[in-house]
Amino acid sequence: MGAGRAAGLRRHTLGAVSPTPLPDPELLPRLRADLAAAAYTVDGVQQVLGPVAAGALHREQRLPADLATRHRSDRAAVLVRLFALGFPVAWDDADRALPTLRADGAVQLGLARAEGADLRATCDLRPYADETHEWWVASDLSEIATGHPLAETHVLGIGNASTTLAEWTIRRPVRRALDLGVGSAVQSLHLAAHAERIVGTDVSQRALAYARFNAALNDLTLELVAGSLLDPVAGQRFDLVVSNPPFVITPRSGGVPRYEYRDAGLVGDGVVEALVRRVGEHLEPGGVAQFLGNWEIRRGADWRERWREWLAGTGLDAWVIQRDVQDPAEYAELWARDGGVRSGATSFDQMYLSLIHI
């Protein structure tokens, strides 16, 4: 369930990082109505782009989508160019695409800024769906929209890890659910269908701001608390805990960017270990915790030994699926590219060197 779709070593910034959008209670219903009326939905975007351009956009290549929309003025195409591709659109076209909110309203919400006679998005806003629900998710602009590596405070939108977790999560009705590392609230959108109360936590104030906006945009009640891992919910128990935590194994050497969405600041696979050892204290009897993670496999060891060590004394029953194994070079390449640093750049080689020597 929840088959969601969406279409250097120095500190990376895009100049001043754009402010997060505001959950204005007067303007959000207008935005919601305009997006729906424009068919700015997963299926609507697919129809605008066609399968080739939509597939390329999913692989973070925007040229085919640019070609498919460049000379179109229909509402859905204008919104794709504005919010998914990051191109400026004419102010008048934006007014026609958002007839209730208008371009001025998009600026007031913090979704866009004026750029001469054009409107340019300051965040990514895309449709998202599962088998029975449709939503919209705002997040920071991706590197394909900005042309720059990600800022360390970057807040992710809809990604493969998020949709994988959503597909695997047990969807039985629960009283209390915890979305640990809430990010842009993708998991909370799914939880709203079967949880009476949802608590979302994140160490990033920027992520919490996006979660607050997305909850309001999608008419979702969500309790948000700031803090690291399970610290903000000390003494609380839940029927279901879900988490796509910042699990990337990152070198703790100086100068390596610390992307908040993927790096918890712990050594090695410490974030996964901490969750395994502590999450049982926060589960109701019969409760379930489901999360993704990366872990180290020591040379010559069975990968299950590490999990047996972590689980010892927790009282938990565990089902651990090792989906993939990567050697150090493969792992370094994956996560050096993930921040938007391109192969061949000096910063890529430096990042690669740091990761491969973890």
Where are these regions (language model features)?
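Conserved Class I SAM-dependent methyltransferase catalytic core
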Residues: 268-321
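N-terminal auxiliary segments of SAM/dcSAM-dependent transferases
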Residues: 18-139, 143-145
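Short, surface-exposed amphipathic charged segments that create phosphate/polyanion-binding patches used
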Residues: 329-345
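Conserved small/polar residues in nucleotide/adenosyl-binding loops
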Residues: 356-358
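Conserved SAM/SAH cofactor-binding pocket of Class I
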Residues: 159-243, 296
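Compositionally biased, low-complexity flexible segments
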Residues: 1-11
